[in-house]
């Protein structure tokens, strides 16, 4: 079953960008890992979409399982592992942790070790509050949602469709120090792609989704050429969140959903828009 889970994860992942054939990583590559998502791995959706598993392989785990193919700079890995563990101990849930500020000394050490960086971006996925626009401040809150919505608003200044300020700062830091920058997106839905689409400083982007207990290993195998990222996008990724017709009326009520876009839901809207 674990092999089936890993294979399904690999087949669903999508290679969104690969300039100059940076991926797959050559045999014997050295990489430096950045981003709390390296350890703050989200295996799947919350609420009714959640399942209990005996273990979870994050991206670091996956790469370490392939250490005959790739070597990891342990200093940055230790930094993010310790930070995420502290946040979990304080009650944070996967995908809802803060991106820590990267010390310049760690960045310099990593850059001396290799010219290849891997940034992991992760997002929690749950019903009712995971797709929030920045101007949507009127949603009613109740029970556990109250705390989660408050945390979401604090973490994601413009909504979780976009990078946070801390994530933007991290990306800028890493781009300034590395010739090859690979991004792994551990997300459950559509996100902003404008920040990497035309940026020559971002070499490759793997949409790894929330790929279950073996998701980290699946992503690592694709990064190192042990498989082909042949998945295709099943959704339309808009330039900005407001381009989706449902954004304007989303979260107006907890009791009902008002389809203000009429029948033009999803692909119907994008296929008929003038």
Task: Describe each PLM feature range.
Residues 2-274:
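C-terminal non-catalytic regions of proteins with extracellular/luminal or membrane-system context
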């Amino acid at each position: 079953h674990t092999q089936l889970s890993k294979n399904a994860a690999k087949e669903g992942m999508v290679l969104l960008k690969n300039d100059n054939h940076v991926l797959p990583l050559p045999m014997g590559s050295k990489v430096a890992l950045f981003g709390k998502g390296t350890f703050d791995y989200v295996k799947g959706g919350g609420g009714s979409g959640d399942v209990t598993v005996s273990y979870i392989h994050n991206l670091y785990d996956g790469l370490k399982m392939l250490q005959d193919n790739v070597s990891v700079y342990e200093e940055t890995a230790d930094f993010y592992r310790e930070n995420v563990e502290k946040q979990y101990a304080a009650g944070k849930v996967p995908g809802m942790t803060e991106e820590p500020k990267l010390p310049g000394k760690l960045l310099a050490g990593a850059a001396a070790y290799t010219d290849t960086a891997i940034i992991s971006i992760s997002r929690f996925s749950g019903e009712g509050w995971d797709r929030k626009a920045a101007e949507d401040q009127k949603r009613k809150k109740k029970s556990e949602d109250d705390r989660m919505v408050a945390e979401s608003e604090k973490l994601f200044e413009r909504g979780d469709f976009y990078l946070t300020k801390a994530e933007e700062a991290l990306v800028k830091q890493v781009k300034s120090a590395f010739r090859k920058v690979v991004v792994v997106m551990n997300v459950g839905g559509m996100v902003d792609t404008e920040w990497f689409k035309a940026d020559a400083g971002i070499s490759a982007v793997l949409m790894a989704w929330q790929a279950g207990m073996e998701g980290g290993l699946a992503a690592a195998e694709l990064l190192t050429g042990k498989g082909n990222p042949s998945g295709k996008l099943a959704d339309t990724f808009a330039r900005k969140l407001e381009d989706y017709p449902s954004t304007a009326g989303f979260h107006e009520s907890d009791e009902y959903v008002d389809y203000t876009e009429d029948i033009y839901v999803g692909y119907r809207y994008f296929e008929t828009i003038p």
